[in-house]
Amino acid sequence: MAAKDVKFGNDARVKMLRGVNVLADAVKVTLGPKGRNVVLDKSFGAPTITKDGVSVAREIELEDKFENMGAQMVKEVASKANDAAGDGTTTATVLAQAIILKVMKAVAAGMNPMDLKRGIDKAVTVAVEELKALSVPCSDSKAIAQVGTISANSDETVGKLIAEAMDKVGKEGVITVEDGTGLQDELDVVEGMQFDRGYLSPYFINKPETGAVELESPFILLADKKISNIREMLPVLEAVAKAGKPLLIIAEDVEGEALATLVVNTMRGIVKVAAVKAPGFGDRRKAMLQDIATLTGGTVISEEIGMELEKATLEDLGQAKRVVINKDTTTIIDGVGEEAAIQGRVAQIRQQIEEATSDYDREKLQERVAKLAGGVAVIKVGAATEVEMKEKKARVEDALHATRAAVEEGVVAGGGVALIRVASKLADLRGQNEDQNVGIKVALRAMEAPLRQIVLNCGEEPSVVANTVKGGDGNYGYNAVXRRIRQHDRHGYPGSNQITRSALQYAASVAGLMITTECMVTDLPKNDAADLGAAGGMGGMGGMGGMM
């Protein structure tokens, strides 16, 4: 077992505090619309330029192991805030540093760390309730656009694109951010259900000018098996031909004789058919086939439940208003499935999302909900260079997360003003003893830190602005873009309640753990450990003197 280095009490806390300050000082320069960029060196390729707090935090590793422990604990604040709300990482880091700096002084003065922690926890618990009371719903497009604009560093184009995307695919719809091909940001909306599987043969193409297959009011056959024998399909093909409608086949695979016969029939005009592979693999494929069946009012033909393809009838087939298939994707528009059945399926998947343990599973389940509930919107980010593209894409993703959080829990006054208002309301809050009262005061004072840092990053005097804002009420706050203090309307500069709440809770949680730390243990560097071992060995040789 490796030798350990151990530090106690104030020595441990001082080292930890140094690490906290290094990380927080690097992160907090990015806060607010006038926040600065941070350049991150990469082992290969061009350096990354970012204004994203969690991206900066994740890059920081300190040489001193005790200082690094402090930095890593604050890094946890940024990561947790990012996981919970997708944004607010810099705010959380600034709050954590403010609480830790002030409360460490109280601990050094001899106050009880446990009572200080209880005071901080009490203040934060009441503050969260006050934030909830202050929040107003964020439901109209103007409010959504404002939240997106603020979070994207006052980029109005991004805010409007996010609001438009939410308007088209709904609050539950999937909105993704991708690299664009030009200089302008674009919004691409895919209505209906789209999955990543294209036609199995180019001979199915009936729109040569677009290289796509378009089927109007088709029947849709869903089979959870490979189809290689055309005899299995003859009854269905004959029934569809009599009905005079096209047919889309979605199966695990269609190959050999079956595929060749379908191609020949299509080319001769006997029946208009297209075949694609089912999306996904294994259990996910079965689930997605069932989603398509629910959306189109069809039944999945599966031997697992005793259904045979030869016995399938028109009643087992799904239907849609239109299907578009190209080389890589299939889009089903306006399936005829019953609304109640679709909502039931969505509720079932939402339950699975709550129970999911991995982020990957959760993301895939959310995509399925979106495909059933509305559609998918893609925001394509335009930029002149790859470095700018990365930075802008990160900002758009943050804005998207902030907007979703605002829709979920409402908005409060942004720019740190909501925390100032909450702190003013809690001025008379008291604990069970004087040490707890100090903890409460520390938490309330720390709530000013985000506003102060935003003002500092604008090159103004934080104390003057903070005191002026404290003298007002409601949305009276500092506009960092125009660099002036003014009364704003409800949509002036809103911030997400969820992001503000998460930042405060995670900052207080980690600060509480750090102030109650009395001992830190880490491995000795290898050189120090080797020297220690060698000294021990030489000491044992003292007995050799008696042998001379």
UniProtKB/Swiss-Prot annotation:
Q: Subunit structure, per the record? A: Forms a cylinder of 14 subunits composed of two heptameric rings stacked back-to-back. Interacts with the co-chaperonin GroES.
Q: Name the catalysed reactions.
A: ATP + H2O + a folded polypeptide = ADP + phosphate + an unfolded polypeptide
Residues bound to ATP: 30-33, 51, 87-91, 415, 479-481
For this record, an example GO cellular component is: cytoplasm
State if Glycosyltransferase is listed as a keyword.
Answer: no
Per the record, the GO terms for biological process are: protein refolding
| Localization | Cytoplasm
Q: Which InterPro entries does the record match to this protein? A: Chaperonin_Cpn60_CS, Cpn60/GroEL, Cpn60/GroEL/TCP-1, GroEL-like_apical_dom_sf, GROEL-like_equatorial_sf, TCP-1-like_intermed_sf
Q: Give the enzyme's EC designation.
A: 5.6.1.7
* Lineage start: Bacteria, Pseudomonadati, Pseudomonadota, Gammaproteobacteria, Lysobacterales
Give a short account of what the protein does: Together with its co-chaperonin GroES, plays an essential role in assisting protein folding. The GroEL-GroES system forms a nano-cage that allows encapsulation of the non-native substrate proteins and provides a physical environment optimized to promote and accelerate protein folding.
An example molecular function term from Gene Ontology annotations: unfolded protein binding
Cleaved signal peptide residues = none
The primary site where this protein sits is cytoplasm
Q: Which family does it belong to?
A: Belongs to the chaperonin (HSP60) family.
Q: List keywords of the entry alphabetically.
A: ATP-binding, Chaperone, Cytoplasm, Isomerase, Nucleotide-binding
Q: What is this protein called?
A: Chaperonin GroEL
- Cited Pfam families: Cpn60_TCP1
Q: Which organism is it from?
A: Stenotrophomonas maltophilia (Pseudomonas maltophilia)
